[in-house]
């Protein structure tokens, strides 16, 4: 009968066991694949005292030569292994021969390092291995050592040591297993490389999963098949593929599954752990095969969940060699192993779909991003866990704001993942604010310290006659101002903290009270009154910007989105109805001289927002027709800012780049087999990432007719199929198409304002011109809005607007106020021909003739006193810039 390792290693005394334990650690650190004799001898030699050292000293072995031999032997070992495969054959042989010598020759009950050395000198195979490491050991006479062993080692600490298996601390663990330097052989592969989701569900360690009943039911249908019973969950990162599997585990534990699935164990495979340390060819595949064999042989039915299943394709080696997916195929096809896979759609197309044999063994189950209502329900299921973790109260308005704002302003991620991250961050911010100083107070403290540092430097310079009295006085005033503001803010923060702490405690007591089967009504009313009083006190000491929040609300959510995106909080919290109602006013402020066009645009968008338009179509599809420079692009910018929170939500496509028919693929994405497949299209990817946006198709008349036809599905159904077969949703976008078709006709019609036609007449006159470029089917799907040539009053207004913008820059940069005469405005308008370039010529003229004069004035008189008036005038055909005598009072 073979001797077990447990019994063999248990006979080592404490010195030898510690030595081989540290030898396994050194072996792993050096990257050696096996624990060798050299590791053990090296560690024994570096111990403070033992039999080995007494024997070496007794026989006068050259210590320097012995240590050089150890170092050289270690250097000769192969390196590069990420884990230890096992103990070498020589280790086990040496222990076995040492035990024979100790028990039979020395009548001892444990193995000492001296016994180990005797065994290595006695056995010819071990002797060769020892002398290869340390040739100096040949000087030790075997007979002398054997006969005088007890005398030579009488002072060794090993004399009084017992065998390891005689210690109450010994549990049969092999050397290296306790420190994880070497993997134990007794651990089941299935338990080592998987996590039991059903066990976690029983222990309450999985959060509730809501809103995925359809996906779970479909997955159960697939799992109950006799063959090819393997669902493959595909969907964008963050839509909740893993949560669907966790929902299945919860349903199994809750007894909501049919009998065939009621007793199964749902195990998730850790692919990273499976591949970690698999340095030798075939080791990864061997581990995976052991997992599959144990799963199929398990007495309890097992369903294996492989997240990121595409990592198994090619994971075991290069393409065509040892592909781990090939190990899965037979078991999956025969139905012996039920497997749930999960991967993103792009990874599925890139890796799995290319292997038809693997693809047909899975049934693809698409997990789509939930709508806003479903996502809110999902967050409600997570609310108790978040409240318990952070110790805060989450209002329902915070859940709605997290979903709505993340859906609109964080388009790069998916619901519910981004809403959960947003809500989790909000909870953390509210919890932290109760213990750390607010950002405003920290900023004031920093500014005060910065000013104090500069003041100290100036005071030092003053001793050397280099003082700056004005700067010193300014810094002293700044420090005093910041200190006063910081003290005031500190007091308010402390007061808010105390009240919020009291409110939180009262809410906790009140919640525990009402949770009782028969709550005390009198106490409930008492605590409710106390809570109302505390909240009223908090409102009294607060300003518009609270320093400490008593709960997670919509304002906290909006502040975090503002930090992440840079969009103003007010614009995010503004509801859609108010944004639509303010749209006409916003457009009139930015787009000058187009009242009829703006009214028509506003009315159409209002109709769509009221739900009266076809819900399958985009919010609006408008073709803005007119000369260049009359406000078409500015209209798109104004709508993006008013309706979608900022100009960053404007997607601009220059259609002059799509004059050939083959350029259609760059808009929607290349089809399979073509260069660029899988990278997405310019338009489809932009809308997929920003579903709430204005899409500006500039100079649409220059695009190829095939490109025009591409948009028919967008105009009719509000969606476009990209090159990968995904449908991109355009229902929340506003499409603006700009065109210069009919510009000359419009200029002629409005050459004389008295004979200009009305709006219907303009459209009738434009129709023949448009039909020369666009087919009737295209024009029938868009709303044509003519943009008229700008009149004199509109041009003057535009000039004043641009000069006012220059004045704003002057005020912010130099604290100077800009004024200008009417002569300047009239001169700019009279000198610019706007027939072909529109308002762009006016702006270019101002930037070429007026702005340089202001710039030279600033550089020449750079020490001009702040708060003065800079006046621009036209004198003798030349623009002049001067300072008025009067000064603006703050």
Curated annotation (Swiss-Prot):
Which SUPFAM superfamilies is this protein grouped with? Double Clp-N motif, P-loop containing nucleoside triphosphate hydrolases
- The residues that hold ATP 1 are 235-242
The compartments listed are: Cytoplasm
Q: Name any one GO molecular function.
A: ATP binding
- Region: Linker; residue ranges are 370-566
Region annotated NBD1 sits at 171-369
Sequence segments annotated as region (NBD2): 567-789
Instruction: Using the UniProt annotation, give all residue ranges assigned to the region (Repeat 1).
Output: 12-77
Q: Quick one: where's region C-terminal? A: 790-890
A Gene Ontology annotation in the biological process aspect, one of them, is: cellular response to heat
The source's domain of life comes to Bacteria
**Binding-site list for ATP 2:** 626-633
* Predominant cellular place of this UniProt entry's protein: cytoplasm
The GO cellular component terms are: cytoplasm
Fetch the InterPro entries from UniProt.
AAA+_ATPase, ATPase_AAA_core, ATPase_T6SS_ClpV1, Clp_ATPase_C, Clp_N_dom_sf, Clp_R_dom, ClpA/B, ClpA/B_CS1
What residues form the membrane-spanning segments? none
Keywords from UniProt, A to Z, are: ATP-binding, Chaperone, Coiled coil, Cytoplasm, Nucleotide-binding, Repeat, Stress response
Q: Does the keyword Nuclease apply?
A: no
Q: Does the UniProt entry include the keyword Ubl conjugation? A: no
Q: Which residues form the Clp R domain?
A: 9-150
One matching Pfam family, short form? AAA_lid_9
The role this protein plays is: Part of a stress-induced multi-chaperone system, it is involved in the recovery of the cell from heat-induced damage, in cooperation with DnaK, DnaJ and GrpE. Acts before DnaK, in the processing of protein aggregates. Protein binding stimulates the ATPase activity; ATP hydrolysis unfolds the denatured protein aggregates, which probably helps expose new hydrophobic binding sites on the surface of ClpB-bound aggregates, contributing to the solubilization and refolding of denatured protein aggregates by DnaK. Affects level of invasin and motility in Y.enterocolitica.
Protein family: Belongs to the ClpA/ClpB family.
Subunit annotation: Homohexamer. The oligomerization is ATP-dependent.
**Domain remarks in the Swiss-Prot or TrEMBL record:** The Clp repeat (R) domain probably functions as a substrate-discriminating domain, recruiting aggregated proteins to the ClpB hexamer and/or stabilizing bound proteins. The NBD2 domain is responsible for oligomerization, whereas the NBD1 domain stabilizes the hexamer probably in an ATP-dependent manner. The movement of the coiled-coil domain is essential for ClpB ability to rescue proteins from an aggregated state, probably by pulling apart large aggregated proteins, which are bound between the coiled-coils motifs of adjacent ClpB subunits in the functional hexamer.
Q: What is this protein called?
A: Chaperone protein ClpB
Organism, by scientific name, is Yersinia enterocolitica
